[in-house]
């Protein structure tokens, strides 16, 4: 970015006073990396630390950021401000050093709020669907030539990045309720996709507390702002009278302001109509499978329509939507060894969903788009607390697949909880009589175990939020063929 471009940008977003060098602790996370990328492109000096390199840190390095793969006090001493992710503990040596040096230490959402402060902010909140909905809104605004800034929690495939600095007043961002930090944001428009019990440790196990926090978030909208809310969700519907702001509802429900009708799925695409108040009927082809993605698209259409974006721009963006990383992410269709003389192949899909509702939506999308295929799922539970709190829901949802490979729980720093482990979950599913899960304690053996159960016309769902994405990429690299010991040795 040249000096002239930077000067023009400063007329939209005033420079943060006395801030020159911004340091991120936990910079490799998607949400942190996205904000760091926008700030790097605004001309700030960026540094950060994390435990290991990943695509996010590699990309930031290419933008000129200084990345350390260790946490040491000296990393922060030149910083104007330190931004910290929720995964970082207060006794981290960089946090301790920053506080001792009287360097401000802020959470990720505070920096996002600062980026949003002088822009027209569109914040996407909810338990599920945030990342995809944020990407859809961003895609529509880009298609309309509005050149938005966006900060997303997942890879926006069309842009090849989690975040992008635009030249306009629009900032589209995912709003994270996991630590209640979305309360820092003060957007002009807020989407709420749904509200379910998740991250309940943040809310003292009190669902009423979680609901009130969403209301407080919506009250951050100015009185002339707008809440776009999914009326199909019973909790969202219950909260509507308490919002006290202009509201547009969306969903399949008859009383939705933006109503989805005549939904059908053909392979990876959804086809439906949208009825809007005082607007012509919109016939949509969406390049994303599942009714849940039709809901995400309806939210994006509601926001775009309110902003006055032309229908043709909306329709082009949705038909050409390239999706986001690890959200029903198609990794390939691979030929398999013949079974009983019949040639076969298997489709490989990687998905981040790790809550029973998300897993259920992914399975339903797979069944609707490919009804003749067996669903073979490789599932990694995420966190012992979530497995404990939603144990029966997981058992019910996972029982819907045809073949289930279960990895050990990805702890995410939590201590084990008796009875909330993968072996117990496998036993519960087995005892219900629908399915005999295969427990895979060594994730390195997934290619071998999977090869033994595939039969030539399968859809493989690699499902979870831990490190299972690496397994999906490994399966794609191997084209579903397990390595021999000799190949492993020479690889």
UniProtKB/Swiss-Prot annotation:
Keyword Cytoplasm listed: yes
Q: Supply the alphabetized keyword list.
A: ATP-binding, Cell cycle, Cell division, Cell shape, Cell wall biogenesis/degradation, Cytoplasm, Ligase, Nucleotide-binding, Peptidoglycan synthesis
The question of whether Cell cycle is a record keyword is answered with yes
- Domain of life per record: Bacteria
Q: Which Pfam families match?
A: Mur_ligase, Mur_ligase_C, Mur_ligase_M
State any single GO MF term: UDP-N-acetylmuramate-L-alanine ligase activity
Q: Which EC number(s) does UniProt give? A: 6.3.2.8
Which terms in the GO cellular component ontology are assigned?
cytoplasm
Q: In which pathway does it act?
A: Cell wall biogenesis; peptidoglycan biosynthesis
Q: Where in the cell is it found?
A: Cytoplasm
**Quick one: which residues bind ATP?**
126-132
Which transformation does this protein catalyse, written as a reaction? UDP-N-acetyl-alpha-D-muramate + L-alanine + ATP = UDP-N-acetyl-alpha-D-muramoyl-L-alanine + ADP + phosphate + H(+)
One annotated GO biological process: cell division
Q: Kindly list any coiled-coil regions of this protein.
A: none
The UniProt entry, under InterPro entries, shows: Mur-like_cat_sf, Mur_ligase_C, Mur_ligase_C_dom_sf, Mur_ligase_cen, Mur_ligase_N, MurCDEF_pg_biosynth, UDP-N-AcMur_Ala_ligase_MurC
NCBIfam families linked to this entry: murC
The family annotation for this protein states: Belongs to the MurCDEF family.
Q: What does this protein do?
A: Cell wall formation.
Q: Which protein are we looking at?
A: UDP-N-acetylmuramate--L-alanine ligase
The coding gene here is murC
């Amino acid at each position: 970015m040249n000096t002239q471009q930077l000067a023009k940008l400063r007329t939209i977003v005033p420079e943060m006073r006395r801030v020159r060098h911004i340091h991120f602790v936990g910079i490799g996370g998607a949400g942190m990396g996205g904000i760091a990328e926008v700030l790097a492109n605004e001309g700030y000096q960026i540094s950060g630390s994390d435990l290991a390199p990943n695509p996010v840190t590699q990309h930031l390095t290419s933008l000129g950021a200084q990345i350390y793969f260790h946490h040491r006090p000296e990393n922060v001493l030149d910083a104007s401000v330190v931004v910290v992710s929720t995964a970082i503990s207060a006794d981290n040596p960089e946090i301790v050093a920053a506080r001792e040096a009287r360097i401000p230490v802020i959470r990720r959402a505070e920096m996002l709020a600062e980026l949003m402060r002088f822009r027209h902010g569109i914040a996407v909140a909810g338990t599920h669907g945030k990342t995809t909905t944020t990407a859809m809104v961003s895609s529509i605004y880009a298609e309309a030539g509005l050149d938005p800034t966006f900060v997303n929690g997942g890879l926006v495939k069309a842009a090849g990045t989690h975040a992008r600095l635009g030249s306009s007043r629009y900032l589209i961002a995912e709003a994270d309720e996991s630590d209640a930090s979305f309360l820092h944001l003060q957007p002009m428009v807020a989407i709420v996709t749904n509200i379910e019990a998740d991250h309940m440790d943040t809310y003292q196990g009190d669902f009423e507390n979680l609901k009130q926090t969403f209301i407080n978030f919506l009250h951050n909208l100015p009185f002339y702002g707008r809440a776009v809310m999914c009326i199909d969700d019973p909790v969202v519907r219950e909260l509507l009278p308490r919002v006290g702001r202009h509201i547009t509802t969306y969903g399949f429900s008859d009383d939705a302001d933006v109503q989805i009708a005549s939904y059908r799925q053909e392979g990876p695409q959804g086809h439906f109509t949208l009825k809007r108040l005082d607007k012509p009927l919109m016939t949509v082809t969406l390049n994303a499978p599942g009714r849940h993605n039709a809901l995400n698209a309806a939210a994006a259409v509601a926001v775009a329509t309110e902003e006055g974006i032309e229908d043709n721009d909306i329709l082009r963006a949705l038909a050409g939507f390239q999706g986001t990383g690890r959200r029903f992410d198609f990794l390939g269709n691979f030929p398999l060894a013949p079974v009983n003389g019949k040639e076969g192949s298997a489709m490989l899909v990687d998905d981040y969903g790790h809550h029973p509702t998300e897993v259920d939506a992914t399975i339903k999308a797979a069944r609707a788009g490919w009804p003749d295929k067996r669903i073979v799922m490789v599932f990694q539970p995420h966190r012992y607390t979530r497995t404990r709190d939603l144990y029966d829901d997981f058992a019910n949802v996972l029982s819907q697949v045809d073949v289930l490979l279960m990895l050990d729980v990805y702890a995410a720093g939590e201590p084990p909880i008796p009875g909330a482990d993968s072996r117990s979950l496998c036993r519960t599913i087995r005892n219900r009589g629908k399915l005999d899960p295969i427990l895979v304690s060594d994730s390195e053996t997934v290619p071998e175990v999977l090869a033994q159960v595939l039969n030539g016309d399968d859809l493989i769902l690699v499902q979870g939020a831990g490190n299972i994405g690496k397994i999906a990429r490994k399966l794609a690299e191997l084209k579903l063929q397990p390595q021999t010991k000799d190949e492993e040795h020479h690889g």
